[in-house]
Amino acid sequence: ATGNVWAKDGYLVIIKTGCKYNCYILGKNKYCNSECKEVGAGYGYCYAFGCWCEGLPESIPTWPLPDKTCGTK
């Protein structure tokens, strides 16, 4: 706990497509961890083939996006 009361957890989402960041090595995952940290999260790992971030800033959108489902234009 960093004492940041505004943090949330969630799947990282690609804003353009509404898709999750895909990952294949479940659990501890370097790619997810670095992508999550890139947007200010505490850490990230691969859960159900998507990058899950813990301790995300409130301002970072997470999956699912209200107006975009992955795969539809």
Swiss-Prot record:
GO terms for molecular function: sodium channel inhibitor activity; toxin activity. It is found in: Secreted. This is Neurotoxin Cex13. SMART domains: Knot1 (SM00505). Its main location: secreted. Expressed by the venom gland. Pfam families: Toxin_3. GO terms for biological process: defense response. Has the structural arrangement of an alpha-helix connected to antiparallel beta-sheets by disulfide bonds (CS-alpha/beta). It comes from the Eukaryota. The keyword Membrane does not apply. Disulfide bonds join C19-C70, C23-C46, C32-C51, C36-C53. The modification Cysteine amide is found at C70. Residues 71-73 form a propeptide. GO terms for cellular component: extracellular region. Residues 1-7 form the signal peptide. Residues 8-71 form the LCN-type CS-alpha/beta domain. Belongs to the long (4 C-C) scorpion toxin superfamily. Sodium channel inhibitor family. Beta subfamily. InterPro entries: LCN-type_CS_alpha_beta_dom (IPR044062), Scorpion_toxin-like (IPR003614), Scorpion_toxin-like_sf (IPR036574), Scorpion_toxinL (IPR018218), Scorpion_toxinL/defensin (IPR002061). Keywords: Amidation, Disulfide bond, Ion channel impairing toxin, Neurotoxin, Secreted, Signal, Toxin, Voltage-gated sodium channel impairing toxin. Beta toxins bind voltage-independently at site-4 of sodium channels (Nav) and shift the voltage of activation toward more negative potentials thereby affecting sodium channel activation and promoting spontaneous and repetitive firing.
